[in-house]
Design a protein with these regions (language model features):
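Acidic, metal-binding active-site segment of PIN/NYN-like and related structure-specific nucleases
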Residues: 3, 9, 162-179, 184
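Acidic beta-strand-loop-alpha-helix segment within the catalytic core
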Residues: 42-130, 177-199
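Active-site neighborhoods of divalent-metal-dependent phosphate/nucleic-acid chemistry enzymes
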Residues: 139-148
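Flexible, acidic active-site loops/lids enriched in D/E/S/T/G that coordinate Mg2+ and/or position polar
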Residues: 1-46, 53
């Protein structure tokens, strides 16, 4: 038996297998003709992420990962970047537009991180941002106000590409807690040092 949890159709109960699907991550971008959106699909088996796929239809880039088998971009193995810290790092993020109560905390994080890095990008698809971390395009990523379908596939991609993933306090509640930090091991730890005290 398979269950489906999808942004567009809600939750369907089932047994051991649970598909987590976002058929269009970056809906606002798509509606405005901004070319940054993706399809995100993850499969959990008995509560554990086993497979993830993020597809960028405009660039024909398919990021895939299976637990224990690494991460790939169009069948080519990918790894997180080797950057040793925030100096010169390129970060990805997203703004908490759904819940303005988080805005002050987020702006504090942004202010702390922007001065130490080469730049911060906000493209608008959390799934693609996480895929970019896995491929070494972003050195780290952080965002709040997210849903499980925004991050499930991307989180597995990052882990299988040698990166680390957590919630803002360093815990494991990143799938359902609404917040995520991801990156190569060094940049992940540096971003986490900023997010922890500002919560």
């Amino acid at each position: 038996d398979h269950a489906i949890l999808a942004e567009e159709s809600g939750n369907q109960d089932g047994n051991d297998y649970r598909w987590i699907i976002d058929p269009l991550d970056g809906t606002t971008n798509y509606l405005h003709g901004f070319p940054q959106f993706s399809v995100s699909i993850a499969l959990k088996y008995k509560g554990r992420l086993e497979h993830g796929l993020v597809y960028d239809p405009l660039r024909e880039e398919m990021f895939t990962a299976s637990r224990g088998s690494g991460a790939q971009l169009n069948d080519r193995k990918i790894r997180v970047s080797a950057r040793k810290g925030l100096e010169g790092a390129l970060l990805g993020t997203g703004f908490p537009y759904r819940d303005q109560r988080q805005l002050d905390a987020y702006l504090g994080m942004f202010k702390s991180l922007v001065k130490d890095t080469a730049g911060i990008r906000r493209p608008g698809s959390a799934a693609l941002d996480l895929a970019y971390v896995a491929a070494g395009r972003h050195d780290a990523f952080w965002e709040m106000g997210l849903q499980v379908w925004d991050v499930a596939a991307g989180a597995l991609l990052v882990q299988e590409a040698g990166g680390l993933v957590s919630d803002f306090s360093g815990g494991s509640n990143y799938l359902t807690g609404g917040e995520i930090v991801a990156g190569n091991p060094k940049c992940f730890k540096a971003v986490l040092q900023v997010t922890k005290p500002l919560l």
